């Protein structure tokens, strides 16, 4: 259970070797922080940037989901081999990592059966009992499980 505070708080967890190496510049922290503070009255009180390493993702999800009312993650939910965030979050919450029927249907419709390859199908695998976050920029949805919101790029909202 998240720690109860007088003010609702949140942490941001940026996941990606490309951020840590400097190959990619983060565009999400400022957007999420401004949006949560200005629109929702939620204080962002911690930001972490971690690599695409399962043990590290699991550890951080466990810690942050207990410490904060909300946790917002970015990165690691795409079609490539290093996109392991959804699977790691499932493990952190000790739940199954499986195809989400609605996510699968959305992605299959978007890409078409011919172009719906294994990498794209992987984006339809989520922790069991996740709720979808619809993506206005592409078909790839994010998800919510417990107090963790996982989305590829929040600045697209």
What are these regions (language model features)?
Residues 5-11:
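Extreme N-terminal starter segment of soluble prokaryotic enzymes
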Residues 7, 30-92:
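N-terminal small/polar loop signature for handling phosphorylated ligands or for N-terminal nucleophile
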Residues 22, 50, 151:
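Active-site-adjacent beta-strand anchor residues
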Residues 56, 84-152, 156-157:
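Proline/glycine-rich low-complexity loops and linkers
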Residues 15-17, 73-81, 152-154:
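Glycine-rich beta-strand-to-loop/alpha-helix junction loops that act as flexible
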Residues 15, 19-29:
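Glycine- and acidic-residue-enriched helix-capping/strand-helix junction motifs
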